Amino acid sequence: MSGPSQDSEPEAKVLHIKRLYRAVVETVHKLDIIISGKSSYREVFKPENISLRNKLRELCVKLMFLHPVDYGRKAEELLWRKVYYEVIQVIKTNKKHIHSRSALECAYRTHLIAGVGFFQHLLLYIQSHYQLELQDCIDWTHVTDPLIGRKKPVSATSKEMEWAQMACHRCLVYLGDLARYQNELAGVEAEQLAERFYHQALSVAPHVGMPFNQLGTLAGSKFYNVEATYYYLRCIQSETPFDGAYGNLKRLFDKASKMYHQVKKQEMKKLSPSRQRSKDIKRLLVSFMYLQSLLQPKNSLMETELTSLCQSVLEDFNLVLFYLPLPAHGSQSASEEEEEHDSVGSVLPDSLIFKMVVICLMVVHSLKRGASKQYSASIAFTLALFSHLVNHVNIRLQAELEEGESDVPALRTDNTDDADARDHSSAALSEERTLQNGSLEEDDDEEEEEKENGEDEPKGNGRTVATKKNQEKKRSAEEKQKQKRKFSRLSMLRRRRCAHKEDESDLSEGFESDEEEEEEEEGGGGGLVDGLGAPRVQMNSLGRDTRKGPLPEDGGWESGSEEDEGGTAFDVETDSDMNSQESRSDLEDMEDAENAPQQPQQEENEQPQTSREENATPPVTNGPSVSNDASISSNLQAMSSQLFQAKRCFRLAPTFSNVLLRPATTTPPAPESNPAPVQEITPPTGETPRNTSPEIANGTNDKDPDSNSEGSEHSNHSFHSEKTLSERLEILTNQGLIQVVKVFLDWLRTNTDIILMCAQSSQSLWNRLSVLLNLLPEGSKILETDIGLNKDVTELLSECEHPSLAQTLLLPEDMALRHLPALSIAHRRLDFTSQRPPLTPLDECVVRVCCIRSFGHFLTNLQGNVLHFNPEAGIFTSISQSEQDNLVQQAKAQFRMAEEEARRNRLMRDMAQLRLQLEVSQLEGSLQQPKAQSSMSPYLVPDTAVLCQHLGLLRQLAASGCFIIIIPRTVIDGLDMLKKENSGARDGIRFLETEFRKGNRYIRCQKESGRSFERDKLKRQDTEAWHLYKMVDSCRQLTGSQSSGDEDTAGMVTILTGHSLEELSERSASMKAAVQAVAAAGMELKNIIEFYRQWKEMG
């Protein structure tokens, strides 16, 4: 005990504390006896037991204020556990006995409400007693008496003040828990309230990870556990983590593994477009969760399997980002009712994308800290994911900036009653916002004002109710129509993946992944938890989530299989055992009765596997803190080269089903300097606009992270009118993914070693980033326009073009990621404790623009030649110096001819398109240089002798990436016949099996199609000649002679043999005729040794 002196008063106080503590122990013992009984759920709400709990509550309150340092925490714990939590657990454990509208249910509801009232009162009393200043942190603040005009003197010690601060934090956690338990009851919507309490607890004590664990429990199985994973990782990486989060996260990863293998096993099934969207999003989220579970520090996996999974997730991520919100319909036919709920899960919200990217950053940080061998793979995947994200930001911004330039029909052809659609309060205002938020809102008559504000809008936008209502009043009817045209323009970008077959080529730009049948699920609906949920009182956190609504049985967001008790009082069941005071993970452990099935072979992995030639990188001075920097750099470049691969310009044979697809209709005339893109894909069936411009198709041309066509350049559009600066800033303000870009660039700025190691292998990322930088307005132009910016923002604008910009203004995304270890260096200059000036959404947007453009100049100063900046034209480029000089000259000529301000946007797009044209020409040259074109064929067809005797040479040809090796069925049959007596045949079979399993795009097995002459008599007389004839038939399929094409196919295919040509011709007349048939079919027959020597001589 502590006391200032040993006089009689402290002695009396000590005796009083002892008596209180003894009374508390006795009361707790009586309550424990009640709780341990078999029918405790009936006993807990009897009047005498309620009185006993009330007595314990009074004793605990007295004890904690008499001696807060020694007894405060213990009294809090006993009060929460014995008075509230254990009663709640008894009821939840026996919920099958608690029927709806029964006396027990009524008593339970009253118990929860009484707990909320008590802790709110306790929170206010602690603030008042210790004069705490929490106005910027929480809603329930103590208001000083205005008549006094000054604070009361506080005689508490520093330790007592510390306890008071943390007691307020814990009260907020308890309030969040009580709201979460209320949310599980039928007819109660308290999820947003619980989330708000948890965020306020974080604002009071941001270093404590407990509220993150509670947010993860609150999220439940929404978005297939991705959201919960984000919160558990945040809890684990907090300064004071909660031990229970480790078990909770492990349980989610175990679920992810099971769900991933279930998804892979499900049969393919044709679905409606909206259900297909839900299935694609489910596949993405489940695969993403499984990948993150494999990237944990203690896990180990084969590199090829990990690479295959990374590529699959990237394909799905790129596909799902093309899904934009469907327009709201005023009326709905009966046939559409089945798909009504699917729209809820048909879009990936921006807040979820934010969480996914931050999960990647947290995993990279933990792998680096643990010196894990998965570190390189994690970085390569994260950069590739961000590359896709930047590309889609470019596409969306470009579509907004070019709104009205071309007539694009609406995606859906349903007859929509526009008048009814306009009756929705958010129809006119939030169509543009739904792009940012990523999901459509559901109507709720009880909260009309929140419906108008876009509940799922991230906090980063900071829009208030009043601001939105004023904007809505100011909008004219013409502007409403303008918004609708804009939405149809954006909705055109949606597409679905094309169907694929076993013999489909890797070389098309389309997407491919297994389609699986959506499993039927039951679960309570839940609002979307905002990933940017910074605990700031001034923000309308209650109005940023998607309102809870009925979720689809097939393709919904919920992945859990919680059962709804038919007649019980509980609506949903969550893992509420993961509560604030206990690590109850042992109570929730799900014993796996069977081992997880092995992951199916990735036979259809369509991603390329190129040779891993390491690029020379500048010396890294700030490398990862692992044992072998050179090994990390090598592995990172190799992994990046696989995830960021350059497309090759091959003309695909008709044998492969996914031949190059071209736009179905006319194309707007393009400038002479901007030829049509090399490869394009059409939108999917069921969502195909009538007029698909090549620019839009080109934007979707992105199967792997390194697409030549960035999709956001539309330089061949002539502008009828340029967007004003205010309109451009409004578009940027409404683009929610800009926040994710800003956060990721903050991380990259503090990890220059990663930038330098991936400078060459991640060229696609820098290309897309340069396009985004050119779309953002310059700081000087914003300063010249009077748009009513904050004074501090104006000062920041003056340094916008400096590479060493020091951000001092806090953004919502910075607050949301406060104390995140991965961003600790980036946030070292930010003051999270001082009073922040209020920033409007426009101010926040301008700050993001400053940070992103400053990062662009930061890249131009790096020694790896990542980006270049042309001061006169004011544009960024990401090409070699010689190409840059050429582009700069053209830019200057066009810049002088154009009007400086009105033509600025078009110039930037022209420059970007020229850069892409040069890249395409470079890639075309890899196969179409004069020397190579004259004597080298793109398709090589080896015979059995090559695979048995010259497998090493064939490996080198395949690894070069210059040829596609086609293995006909007849060659495989020949190897099968020789495998018993020929070891070379067995080696060849093993080699082919390995390459097919990896999905090597340069070694393909050809499936026979079309009519083939069997020559059964010849097969008996001369087997080798018969095999050669069969190979000629296979090659005819490659050259397209069975199709109606008019192209010259001479020299397209070379048959490689392990025998000398003279020897073959002298063997028999049948063999000689077969050799002549090769030449007659326009093919070449060469000895592999001679072919290899000739190829080496030509370089």
From Swiss-Prot:
Its principal location? cytoplasm
- Supply the SMART domains for this chain: PINc
Gene Ontology molecular function terms on file? telomerase RNA binding; telomeric DNA binding
The region called Disordered is annotated at 403-631, 663-722
Q: Where is the composition biased (Polar residues)?
A: 618-631, 688-700
The GO cellular component terms are: cytoplasm; telomerase holoenzyme complex
Basic and acidic residues compositional bias, start-end: 419-434, 469-481, 701-722
Q: Name one GO biological process term.
A: chordate embryonic development
Deleted gene: phenotype: Morpholino knockdown leads to phenotypes ranging in severity from weak to severe that are developmentally delayed with disturbed brain patterning, necrosis in areas of the brain, aberrant eye development, impaired somitogenesis resulting in stacked somites, perturbed yolk sac extension and posterior axis extension with a high mortality rate of 88% at 5 days post-fertilization.
Disulfide connectivity for this sequence is none
Provide ranges: composition bias, Basic residues.
482-499
Which PANTHER family has this protein been placed in? NONSENSE-MEDIATED MRNA DECAY FACTOR, SMG-7 SUPPRESSOR WITH MORPHOLOGICAL EFFECT ON GENITALIA PROTEIN 7
Q: Report the function annotation for this chain.
A: Plays a role in nonsense-mediated mRNA decay. Does not have RNase activity by itself. Promotes dephosphorylation of UPF1. Together with SMG7 is thought to provide a link to the mRNA degradation machinery involving exonucleolytic pathways, and to serve as an adapter for UPF1 to protein phosphatase 2A (PP2A), thereby triggering UPF1 dephosphorylation. Necessary for TERT activity. Required for normal embryonic development.
Please state what the protein is called: Nonsense-mediated mRNA decay factor SMG5
Source organism of the structure: Danio rerio
